[in-house]
Amino acid sequence: MTSWTDFEQAEPELARRARGIISATTNCVLATIRADGSPRASGIDPFFRDGDLWIGSMPDSRKGADLARDPRIALHGIPWESRKVKDGAEDPGDGDVKITGRAVKLGDSEASARILSEYFAEIGVDEPEEGGDLYTIDLATVVVISVADDQLVVDRWSAVDGRKVVKRS
């Protein structure tokens, strides 16, 4: 499994940029795979805690059912122009982030409750009465896409192949 901490150790600058985009936005899109094989896109607010990137699902949600059946995910941090920056978050600059991997359900209910409680307190939201499921991401790829000098810059890291930067005019 490749955790966010593993990624940060391998590529600290790219990890900082990707984390900045995700942490600043209130709006990301998570793609999961439905039972019929078609994609499902869900709005989500991923967060970082204990060296990992986390996502959650509400009790009995379709997203949770998708992840139980097939844990493959894609996460897209919305481009800067179309998103709202969280209060107090640092401006991450231009670009968006795309992450692929597998959602790994946290089976420890006490750890899950602690992580969610800390997160809800941090964002100033009351904890829901019913719990849901909490997942960390086993990273496959992290891509930050930006524009520099009139070129599209695709900065891609893979757990298998490492980092590659491609510039397109």
Q: Model segments located where?
A:
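Charged, gly/pro-rich active-site loop segments
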Residues: 1-13, 80-82, 87-169
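Short, conserved active-site entrance elements at the starts or edges of catalytic domains
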Residues: 5-32
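Short beta-strand segments in beta-sandwich/barrel cores
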Residues: 28, 53, 73, 103-104, ...
